[in-house]
């Protein structure tokens, strides 16, 4: 592997490992929440979210391999990871990639004091920023538009589950 490929390979590898680790954590947390009596909502649209994120990762991996890393966008990406850690730390065992509702009060500390859906804010930013790290502006644009459509469905479903009338 040439020296020019290493930075993009490391970045792409990080994205893939991070997403796989998140899926493992989400699976564990989901099972534990369901065992405690939680209920899943909006399961029908979950495969669409998985397909979107898998396609996004594939586009970055295939088109970004060997591309130079842009330091400005990498710095923004690193800041977004700090937000991710804050969200994960705040939600703890209640964090999942699905809409799992437990009959307990909503979390209102940490980033949830200022944002209703901080994880979606993070994902919106990350779907745009990660491709920009490798100069893939059109990937950022296309997947941001697709993500906006999917998030519209997702947020309506989550709001209906968390804030019933």
Where do the PLM segments sit?
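Long, highly hydrophobic alpha-helical transmembrane signal-anchor segments
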Residues: 1, 42-71
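Feature marks short, highly hydrophobic, charge-poor N-terminal signal-anchor/signal peptide-like helices
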Residues: 1-7
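Aromatic-acidic/polar surface patches that form glycan- and anion
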Residues: 6, 22, 47
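Membrane-embedded alpha-helical segments that form the functional core of polytopic membrane enzymes
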Residues: 8-13, 75-79
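Alpha-helical hydrophobic membrane-insertion segments
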Residues: 9-13, 54, 149
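N-terminal signal-anchor/start-transfer transmembrane helix
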Residues: 12-26
């Amino acid at each position: 592997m040439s020296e020019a490929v290493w930075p993009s390979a490391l970045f792409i590898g990080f994205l893939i490992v991070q997403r796989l680790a998140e899926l493992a954590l989400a699976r564990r947390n989901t099972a534990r929440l369901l065992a405690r009596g939680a209920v899943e909502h909006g399961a029908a649209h979950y495969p669409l979210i998985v397909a979107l994120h898998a396609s996004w990762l594939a586009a970055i991996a295939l088109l970004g391999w060997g591309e130079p890393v842009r330091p400005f966008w990498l710095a923004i990406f690193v800041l977004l990871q700090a937000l991710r850690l804050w969200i994960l730390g705040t939600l703890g065992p209640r964090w999942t990639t699905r809409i799992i509702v437990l009959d307990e009060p909503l979390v209102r500390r940490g980033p949830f004091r200022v944002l209703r859906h901080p994880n979606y804010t993070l994902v919106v930013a990350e779907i745009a920023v990660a491709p920009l790290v490798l100069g893939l502006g059109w990937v950022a644009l296309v997947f941001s538009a697709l993500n906006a459509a999917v998030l519209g469905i997702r947020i309506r479903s989550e709001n209906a589950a968390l804030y019933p009338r």
